[in-house]
C-alpha cells in the first residue's frame, strides 16, 4: 500500500521549507500524532534524548503506533526500555538511520545473524565525522569551515556539534 503523510509538526511552522505543506496537515500539538486513531506510524525527527522526542516516542508506542526514528541520543539512552515497550505493545521500533551513519546494518544483525555471536564491528560509526574528514581531505579546507558547511547542510548539529564530534555520538 502507498505511504500517505497525514500530518506534520515542527517547532517553527512558519519556517521556509522546500515543500509546501497545506495548513490542514499541521498538528496543533506534536503529541497529537501519538493519540490520533488515523495514524499508524509516527516518524520522530526531533532529536535529543529527553524532552519532546522522548515523550512523543514513548506515548506513540504506548498507544500502539509503530515508530521510526533517526535519533541516536534517544536510542542510546532509552533504547532497551523502548524496545521492551514496543515488544509489549506489539509494534515496531525502527532506528536503522540512527546507527553507523545510516548504514543499513540493524536489520541484518537482527534478522540475518541471529545464530551468530558478534564480538566486534569495525566501520564508520559517525556520519558527521566521516563527512567532515572526507570533505577536509577532498577540498583541503579547514576543520572549522567544513564543520560550518556540515551544519548548514544539516549533517552536524547547529551551534554546538559536541555530540557529533567528541565521540559520544559513535559511542551511543
Indicate residue ranges for each PLM-predicted region:
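Structural signal for hydrophobic packing residues in well-ordered secondary-structure cores
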Residues: 1, 12-16, 34, 50, ...
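Rossmann-fold NAD(P)-binding glycine/threonine-rich loop
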Residues: 46-63, 70-110
Amino acid at each position: 500500500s502507498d505511504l500517505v503523510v497525514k500530518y506534520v509538526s515542527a517547532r517553527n511552522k512558519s519556517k521556509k521549507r522546500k515543500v509546501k505543506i497545506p495548513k490542514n496537515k499541521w498538528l496543533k500539538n506534536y503529541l497529537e500524532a501519538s493519540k490520533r486513531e488515523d495514524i499508524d506510524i509516527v516518524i520522530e525527527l526531533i532529536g535529543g534524548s529527553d524532552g519532546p522526542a522522548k515523550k512523543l516516542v514513548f506515548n506513540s508506542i504506548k498507544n500502539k503506533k509503530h515508530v521510526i526514528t533517526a535519533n541516536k541520543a534517544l536510542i542510546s539512552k532509552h533504547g532497551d526500555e523502548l524496545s521492551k515497550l514496543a515488544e509489549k505493545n506489539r509494534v515496531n521500533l525502527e532506528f536503522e538511520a540512527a546507527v553507523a551513519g545510516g548504514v543499513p546494518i540493524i536489520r541484518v544483525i537482527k534478522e540475518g545473524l541471529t545464530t551468530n555471536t558478534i564480538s566486534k564491528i569495525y566501520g564508520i560509526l559517525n556520519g558527521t565525522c566521516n563527512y567532515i574528514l572526507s570533505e577536509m581531505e577532498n577540498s583541503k579546507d579547514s576543520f572549522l569551515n567544513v564543520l560550518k558547511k556540515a551544519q548548514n547542510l544539516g549533517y552536524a548539529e547547529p551551534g554546538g556539534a559536541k555530540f557529533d564530534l567528541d565521540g559520544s555520538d559513535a559511542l551511543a
